[in-house]
């Protein structure tokens, strides 16, 4: 049977026409009547002809040019609302930056939503962990992990102190120009692995970073593990962004990197499981993985949960410290005010680590951190999928004040980054770094659900106090040691004069944070 090119074109045209017709029929003759019956109204709807393919091209282009967050900013400007429909690759997505809708999805109607395709997309590296599971599996994970993040555990700063001082003494001192973003990632993986496993990767110390940990194919160094973890996360983020087509995204390097990560962590898991309980009780410091073995003896469960926590413990805190350094260099008057407050509260010397409560009481320090997290939330973009027919309280109708129908299977994205910079919510200086806005009353600044840097509702980040404590202590030590920070601004700036940001699972600066710390 011979098939010529014209036959293929005809067949393709028929297929596209069929899919277009199906999409239109579904929306106008199935979705709309059901919405009306439930007292809901339509939000703005944007079809990208044909089948949302042009929108896919724009998304891919934004991804490769590190313009993804600007793309979503533009998208909501196009909606001219805080909620709207967008056609992407033949699917209709609901996008929202409306605080009440996000509150409904994350809290009020939490049980109506799941993570959707995210489980399958992330399973290869993270397995059955708190960031991949929904429903009963997620509940079990949270119950297992919550006791491990009590204030007593996360406020012990002595173990962080060694690594923070290593960063300052070996890398920041001497007036060297460094990429602070890279070094903060090294710091946070060193502190996270010490908290989780009782032994650090020590990537900030060139000598100790070459220390090998036993694996099935020989020794794996902390440096090799850190590289494999970074490599695996890079492709993992592509799989998540690919949505329902996640299974098309894989490479041999991804699976090799996952294997290195699994083998590295298995060493600590089996070591903890083999430690007699009475000997473990004699240990003078808290180790996450040892405590977890008291709750379960399943090595796969322990490994998966440890990997999930490592993901949160490394990238989010590193991003917070990186963006904070950038702003403190760009706004020297803010750094001067912060340094003055730190020296007044903690002195010029690192005599002993401050307490958790002392860090929280340093108002200028906390204002700086809050403002950085407003402009650069840890997870700028997130997704959910409705597992039952439900609705948003607002966003529909000509004035955007009527409910919006969210049918079972509907995919939703919410852009925390866009919401926390929205002028309608935060005022005319919404994109300006201004920490003193947090001196105003909370009600005057925001309503509550328009500021969710660590997410919200039952899935709010368990490790947020760990991240805030580490970031706060690191900034205190920087202020104690250095009179100013010089930052070479990234060469690549967007059309809106905003720093280009590399959006993956979390967020980072495209050009790094090239800085010099002056004593």
Swiss-Prot record:
PROSITE patterns, sorted: CYTOCHROME_P450
Function description: Catalyzes the terminal (at the omega-position) hydroxylation of a fatty acid. Probably involved in alkane metabolism. Has minor activity toward myristic acid, palmitic acid, palmitoleic acid and oleic acid.
Record InterPro entries: Cyt_P450, Cyt_P450_CS, Cyt_P450_E_CYP52_ascomycetes, Cyt_P450_E_CYP52_fungi, Cyt_P450_E_grp-II, Cyt_P450_sf
Signal peptide bounds: none
EC code: 1.14.14.80
Residues annotated as binding heme: 461
Gene3D superfamilies named in the record: Cytochrome P450
Keywords associated with the record: Heme, Iron, Membrane, Metal-binding, Monooxygenase, Oxidoreductase, Transmembrane, Transmembrane helix
Entry's family note: Belongs to the cytochrome P450 family.
Membrane-topology annotation of the record: Single-pass membrane protein
One Pfam family here: p450
Induction: Up-regulated when grown on alkanes as sole carbon source.
Cofactors required: heme
Annotated GO CC locations: membrane
Localization of this protein: Membrane
Record field: catalytic activity: an omega-methyl-long-chain fatty acid + reduced [NADPH--hemoprotein reductase] + O2 = an omega-hydroxy-long-chain fatty acid + oxidized [NADPH--hemoprotein reductase] + H2O + H(+); (9Z)-octadecenoate + reduced [NADPH--hemoprotein reductase] + O2 = 18-hydroxy-(9Z)-octadecenoate + oxidized [NADPH--hemoprotein reductase] + H2O + H(+); hexadecanoate + reduced [NADPH--hemoprotein reductase] + O2 = 16-hydroxyhexadecanoate + oxidized [NADPH--hemoprotein reductase] + H2O + H(+); (9Z)-hexadecenoate + reduced [NADPH--hemoprotein reductase] + O2 = (9Z)-16-hydroxyhexadec-9-enoate + oxidized [NADPH--hemoprotein reductase] + H2O + H(+)
Entry keyword Iron: yes
Keyword Transmembrane helix: yes
Top class in the EC scheme: oxidoreductase
Residue runs in coiled coils: none
Membrane-spanning ranges: 10-30
GO molecular function, one term: heme binding
Tree of life domain: Eukaryota
Protein name (database record): Cytochrome P450 52-E3
Gene designation: cyp52E3
């Amino acid at each position: 049977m011979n098939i010529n090119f014209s036959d293929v074109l005809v067949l393709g045209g028929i297929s596209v026409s069929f899919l277009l017709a199906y999409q239109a029929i579904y929306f106008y003759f199935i979705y709309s009547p059901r919405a009306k019956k439930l007292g809901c109204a339509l939000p703005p709807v944007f079809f990208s002809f044909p089948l949302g393919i042009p929108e896919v091209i724009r998304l891919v282009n934004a991804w490769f040019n590190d313009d993804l967050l600007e793309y979503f900013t533009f998208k909501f400007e196009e909606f001219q609302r805080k909620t709207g429909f967008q056609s992407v690759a033949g699917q209709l997505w609901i996008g929202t930056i409306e605080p009440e809708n996000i509150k409904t999805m994350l809290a009020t109607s939490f049980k109506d939503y799941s993570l959707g395709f995210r489980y399958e997309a992330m399973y290869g590296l993270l397995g059955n962990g708190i960031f991949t599971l929904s429903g009963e599996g997620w509940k079990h994970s949270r119950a297992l992990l919550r006791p491990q993040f009590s204030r007593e555990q996360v406020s012990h700063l002595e173990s962080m102190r060694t690594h923070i001082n290593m960063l300052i003494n070996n890398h920041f001192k001497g007036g060297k120009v460094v990429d602070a973003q890279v070094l903060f990632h090294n710091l946070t993986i060193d502190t996270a692995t010490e908290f989780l496993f009782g032994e650090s990767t020590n990537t900030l110390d060139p000598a100790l970073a070459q220390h090998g940990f036993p694996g099935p194919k020989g020794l794996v160094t902390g440096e090799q593990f850190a590289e494999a973890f970074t490599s695996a996360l890079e492709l993992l983020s592509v799989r998540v962004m690919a949505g329902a087509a996640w299974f098309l995204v894989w490479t041999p390097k991804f699976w090799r990197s996952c294997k290195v990560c699994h083998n590295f962590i298995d060493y600590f898991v089996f070591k903890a499981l083999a430690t007699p309980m009475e000997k473990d009780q004699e240990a003078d410091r808290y180790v996450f993985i040892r405590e977890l073995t008291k709750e379960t003896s399943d090595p796969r469960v322990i490994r998966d949960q440890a990997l999930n926590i490592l993901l949160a413990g490394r990238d989010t805190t590193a991003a917070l410290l990186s963006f904070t350094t950038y702003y403190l260099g760009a706004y020297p008057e803010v750094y001067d005010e912060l340094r003055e407050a730190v020296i007044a509260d903690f002195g010029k010397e690192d005599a002993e680590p401050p307490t958790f409560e002392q860090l929280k009481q340093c108002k200028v320090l906390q204002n700086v951190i809050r403002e950085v997290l407003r402009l650069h939330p840890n997870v700028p973009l997130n997704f959910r999928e409705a597992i039952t027919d439900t609705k948003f309280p607002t966003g529909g109708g000509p004035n955007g004040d009527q409910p919006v129908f969210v049918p079972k299977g509907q995919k939703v994205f919410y852009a925390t980054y866009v919401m926390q910079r929205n002028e309608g919510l935060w005022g005319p200086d919404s994109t300006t770094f201004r920490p003193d806005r947090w001196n105003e009353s909370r009600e005057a600044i925001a309503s509550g659900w328009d500021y969710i840097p660590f997410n919200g509702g039952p899935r709010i980040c368990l490790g947020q106090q760990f991240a805030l404590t580490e970031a706060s202590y690191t900034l205190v030590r920087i202020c104690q040691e250095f009179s100013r920070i010089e930052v070479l601004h990234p060469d690549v700036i967007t059309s809106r004069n905003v720093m280009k940001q590399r959006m993956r699972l979390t967020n980072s600066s495209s050009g790094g944070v090239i800085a010099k710390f002056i004593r």
